[in-house]
Design a protein with these regions (language model features):
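Acidic, glycine-enriched catalytic cores built around paired aspartates
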Residues: 39-42, 50-60, 80, 91, ...
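Non-transmembrane, aqueous-exposed alpha-helical and coiled segments at domain scale
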Residues: 58, 62-69, 93
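Carboxylate/His-rich catalytic cores and anion/metal-binding grooves
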Residues: 1-25
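Structural preference for beta-strand elements that scaffold enzyme active sites
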Residues: 33-37, 73-75
């Protein structure tokens, strides 16, 4: 699920899949856990960083709820890039930012080639990054199982975030659809190099 529309359809898509008995049997035969990938890079290119991050957050909540409803464990594979615009950034912060109840002792994410040397090129730095990822996973799995705020506060916050994401999406799409922007971008940057 990589584009904004894909992320928005994650709930209906998973519900439809899990309603098909042969598909459920396949999940059972493969260990009983469904893996679902959420894409950071394409959703960011499609909708801008604010909308992308918010739609990913909502998709993760939908995944959690569907897993709870169906009893099928869902492992989320985070398709993150190296830069902030592609979902990159500190791994531990990304893990801790997951909605409550999403992580259950496991997480899967990509580390792009451009950050491998930075994060794992020296044994001490590699140990530190793995330590931070592991402790974040433990904290998110054990301490973030239930909401940290009351339902009214969460509902109000989600409403504000929906409005912000909608406004950000409209602004971003107006910008990237500006006539001549692609020509200007390709002639004024080294994108073709």
């Amino acid at each position: 699920f990589e584009t904004i529309d894909d992320l928005r359809s994650i709930g209906p898509t998973l519900r439809a899949l899990f309603a098909v008995d042969p598909y459920r049997r396949i999940v059972d035969l493969r260990g009983g856990t469904q893996e679902v990938m959420v894409g950071y890079s394409d959703s960011n290119k499609d909708g801008g960083i604010t909308t992308s991050q918010w739609e990913i957050h909502k998709a993760l909540r939908a995944i959690r709820d569907i897993s709870d409803e169906t009893g099928i464990p869902i492992r989320v594979f985070h398709g993150r890039g190296g830069t902030i615009g592609r979902g990159g950034g500190p791994t531990h912060a990304s893990i801790l930012s997951q909605p409550n109840g999403v992580l259950d002792g496991e997480v899967k994410f990509t580390e792009q080639g451009e950050v491998i040397a930075d994060k794992y090129g020296h044994p001490d730095i590699a140990r530190r990054n793995l330590y931070l990822a592991f402790t974040a996973l433990l904290e998110a799995s054990l301490a973030h199982r239930s909401p940290s705020h009351d339902e009214e506060t969460i509902t109000r916050w989600y409403s504000i975030m929906d409005d912000m994401a909608d406004d950000a999406y409209a602004s971003y799409r107006r910008f990237v659809e500006t006539p001549g922007l692609v020509d200007y971008f390709t002639t004024s940057t080294p994108v073709e190099e």
